[in-house]
Amino acid sequence: MTVAPRIGTATRTTSESDITVEINLDGTGKVDIDTGLPFFDHMLTAFGVHGSFDLKVHAKGDIEIDAHHTVEDTAIVLGQALLDAIGDKKGIRRFASCQLPMDEALVESVVDISGRPYFVISGEPDHMITSVIGGHYATVINEHFFETLALNSRITLHVICHYGRDPHHITEAEYKAVARALRGAVEMDPRQTGIPSTKGAL
């Protein structure tokens, strides 16, 4: 039996941004990313490729003021599209984790497609609060991005930076680790025929 690909879409238009996202959880890593923020585009591309998600993100925001609105609003819409794509959660693995290195940095991500949104981040070095990549991406936004993603997709997400020095490496490892963990958690489990919960609902 052929199963239809799980595709989710979402849009958001405010006075600060106009964002459209489409994600195919059963894709092959094809990406179409344009946010007007080159480093953020790079991170979302890595997210799609390493999650094996077909991912389209088109965003127009007030980047002449700051990247913050565009990054955080993109996380809202991406989370909503993920929730749409995941659907009723029947047959998914639900839990997954990934430890991912990038040179000197090591990041771990743990995901539960729980229906109970929760987010924890720990271990980032203090200079992540003040670092700026490419002149436009303040790494303090990492926490906001992943928290907003977790809340809007209604997942439990833990991100742990075990160690690292370069803000670029830490940030990229975080995006890739979250993508890999999500890929594992939304994967269909041939031994799971129903909702993966003793309660019968997620």
UniProtKB/Swiss-Prot annotation:
GO terms for molecular function: imidazoleglycerol-phosphate dehydratase activity. The keyword Cytoplasm applies. Pathway: Amino-acid biosynthesis; L-histidine biosynthesis; L-histidine from 5-phospho-alpha-D-ribose 1-diphosphate: step 6/9. Pfam families: IGPD (PF00475). One of its GO terms (cellular component) is cytoplasm. It catalyses: D-erythro-1-(imidazol-4-yl)glycerol 3-phosphate = 3-(imidazol-4-yl)-2-oxopropyl phosphate + H2O. Its EC number is 4.2.1.19. CDD domains: IGPD (cd07914). GO terms for biological process: L-histidine biosynthetic process. InterPro entries: IGPD_sf, ImidazoleglycerolP_deHydtase, ImidazoleglycerP_deHydtase_CS, Ribosomal_Su5_D2-typ_SF. The keyword Lyase applies. Belongs to the imidazoleglycerol-phosphate dehydratase family. This is Imidazoleglycerol-phosphate dehydratase. It comes from Corynebacterium glutamicum (strain ATCC 13032 / DSM 20300 / JCM 1318 / BCRC 11384 / CCUG 27702 / LMG 3730 / NBRC 12168 / NCIMB 10025 / NRRL B-2784 / 534). The gene is hisB.
